[in-house]
């Protein structure tokens, strides 16, 4: 981060490898759900941050982790810094996980999967079975399987969230020009 700015991260020690076969893709679903209603941001985090002039937020899910971040937050605005910490708090265990919002993300993720399954991706998927010796690294695609993505329930996502989004699986990182007091 540059002078007068800080970046805020929640690193969640859960990714595709923690999923059972019938859950493949739920870590990625949760990543998407973090941008919808939370306990303190019922209109969603992006809407709140946009009103405050912050546009640089994102997340990604990997095999071993899910990382959420807000970048370029002006540290001269202590109220905004506090709000960003509250966002990390909500992401860590207070997503609302509304069924109607999950249906929106189901469609988005299925489209992401469809667009990502070009010839090179299909070839890479077959090669991964050999590269990773048929381990979970080869069989658990971060984006998820069509079977799981088409049929997961809101209760399954909520159970996965409560099983894995715990303090012993999380780290908060704040980098930049910030006074820790």
PLM ranges: what are they?
Residues 1, 179-181:
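Proteolytic maturation boundary segments
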Residues 4-73, 119, 139-143:
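M16/MPP (pitrilysin/insulinase) zinc-metallopeptidase core fold and M16-derived inactive scaffolds
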Residues 15-20, 75-78, 98, 180:
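Short beta-strands and strand-coil junctions in structured, solvent-facing domains, enriched
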Residues 33, 37-38, 83-87, 91, ...:
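Scaffold signal of the M16-like zinc-metallopeptidase fold and its non-catalytic homologs
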Residues 37-39, 71-105:
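M16/insulysin-pitrilysin zinc metalloprotease superfamily fold
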Residues 46-50, 95-114, 179:
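Acidic/histidine-enriched alpha-helical segments
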Residues 69-74, 106-112, 144-146, 171-179:
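Conserved short loop/turn motifs at secondary-structure junctions
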């Amino acid at each position: 981060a540059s002078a007068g700015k800080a970046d805020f991260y929640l690193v969640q020690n859960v990714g595709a490898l923690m999923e059972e076969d019938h859950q493949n893709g739920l870590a990625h679903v949760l990543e998407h759900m973090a941008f919808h209603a939370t306990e303190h941001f019922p209109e969603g985090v992006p809407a709140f941050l946009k009103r405050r002039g912050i546009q640089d937020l994102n997340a990604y899910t990997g095999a071993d982790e899910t990382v959420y971040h807000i970048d370029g937050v002006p540290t001269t605005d202590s109220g905004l810094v506090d709000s960003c910490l509250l966002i990390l708090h909500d992401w860590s265990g207070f997503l609302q996980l509304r069924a109607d919002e999950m249906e929106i993300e189901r469609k988005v993720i299925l489209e992401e999967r469809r667009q990502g399954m070009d010839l090179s991706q299909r070839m890479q998927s077959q090669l991964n079975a050999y590269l990773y010796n048929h381990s979970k690294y080869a069989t658990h695609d971060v984006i998820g399987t069509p079977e799981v993505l088409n049929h997961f329930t809101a209760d399954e996502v909520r159970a996965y969230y409560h099983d894995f989004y715990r303090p012993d699986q999380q780290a908060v990182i704040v980098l930049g020009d910030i006074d820790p007091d």
